[in-house]
Amino acid sequence: MPLDGVKNIVLVLSGKGGVGKSSVTLQLALALSLQGKSVGILDIDLTGPSIPRLVGLEDAKITQAPGGWIPVPVHTAQNPSSTTQPRGSLRCMSLGFLLRDRGDAVIWRGPKKTAMIRQFLSDVYWGPTDYLLVDTPPGTSDEHIALAEQLLTLASTDPSATAAGLSRLAGAVLVTTPQAIATSDVRKEANFCVKTKIPVLGVIENMSGYSCPCCGEVSNLFSSGGGKVMADELGIKFLGSVPVDVKFGELVEGKVVDDSDSDEEEGATQAQQQEEPVDDRPLVERYKDCWSHSRFEEFAKTLISQIEGASPASG
């Protein structure tokens, strides 16, 4: 059965490209995993799949099993101990894993995109998964319509769905940046959710200033507060804002995240020139060194409270 074992489905939407929707999807997934939840990421941005690059698994390949395609594992679950917190597993599925060459352009018409999305929703074996995050392309295109139609036939928006053993379309998280041009496009995305009867869980304002890696002071690169103003006007929950995190950028670029004090920066730079350090920890553990981890930890806790607090199965 499609989506068998998936409890909650959360769409990550943006009305405009370049707002960091895929990075928000990944950080939400990592934060939910660090709350002990098993998480999957379904990347349906068919013409610009970013998830394989962000998780550092561009060369991974999808395997076929009797139950369907097997998602690529990013990290496994970890049981709690006296020194560690519980950690859920993270797996991902993307068209990027199916391309023969990662530089291949995907030039498809609407019907082929629609068929691919339906196949992703019906032929991927996720197994037991607490949260499936769907990274969507920007705007409201054929992909969004196909996704909404298919999900509303495979899952229910009823909070009691998980108690009945069904997948629940919990809702959508909208991602914007502070500028008016971005928030105006996200308003259209919110309208799309209303028309398709998909609940909106909240708004995240990404790139809300620049966080200095030395002192932590946040400077506004663009205008500020646009996401919150829009959320208030639309009556949508504002989850919070996230400044640009240089350390997260280094993390997804495969560099070692340096959380040392700024006074040691010069010496560390000289040492790195002599010998490039290697960090063998899983991505999720290295993410803890990023400034944005604490912010997304709060987002994850809020979403869990919203979604599971509304479900009879949560007790």
UniProtKB/Swiss-Prot annotation:
Under the heading Pfam families, the entry gives: ParA
Ranges for the region named Disordered are: 256-283
> What does the record's cofactor remark say about binding?
Binds 4 [4Fe-4S] clusters per heterotetramer. Contains two stable clusters in the N-termini of nbp35 and two labile, bridging clusters between subunits of the nbp35-cfd1 heterotetramer.
Asked if the record carries the keyword Electron transport, the reply is no
Gene3D superfamilies reported in the protein's UniProt record: P-loop containing nucleotide triphosphate hydrolases
Can you provide one Gene Ontology molecular function annotated for this UniProt record?
A: 4 iron, 4 sulfur cluster binding
A GO biological-process term: tRNA wobble uridine modification
Q: What does this protein do?
A: Component of the cytosolic iron-sulfur (Fe/S) protein assembly (CIA) machinery. Required for maturation of extramitochondrial Fe-S proteins. The nbp35-cfd1 heterotetramer forms a Fe-S scaffold complex, mediating the de novo assembly of an Fe-S cluster and its transfer to target apoproteins.
- Cited PANTHER family: CYTOSOLIC FE-S CLUSTER ASSEMBLY FACTOR NUBP2 (PTHR23264:SF19), NUCLEOTIDE-BINDING PROTEIN NBP35 YEAST -RELATED (PTHR23264)
Instruction: Summarize subunit and interaction data from the UniProt record for this chain.
Output: Heterotetramer of 2 nbp35 and 2 cfd1 chains.
Protein known as: Cytosolic Fe-S cluster assembly factor cfd1
Species for this entry: Aspergillus clavatus (strain ATCC 1007 / CBS 513.65 / DSM 816 / NCTC 3887 / NRRL 1 / QM 1276 / 107)
